[in-house]
Amino acid sequence: GATIMPGTLWCGKGNSAADYLQLGVWKDTAHCCRDHDGC
């Protein structure tokens, strides 16, 4: 399974977000990870 940093849904291997707009508790960090995943 995916390993995601606690408090985020996008930082780590894969993501656990239900959709693109879902970020988790640490929104600024998750936003950066989500943008990086899209590269």
From Swiss-Prot:
Inhibited by morin and p-BPB. GO terms for biological process: arachidonate secretion; lipid catabolic process; phospholipid metabolic process. It comes from the Eukaryota. Disulfide bonds join 11-33. It is found in: Secreted; Nematocyst. Gene3D superfamilies: Phospholipase A2 domain (1.20.90.10). This is Phospholipase A2. It comes from Bunodosoma caissarum. The lineage of its organism: Eukaryota, Metazoa, Cnidaria, Anthozoa, Hexacorallia.
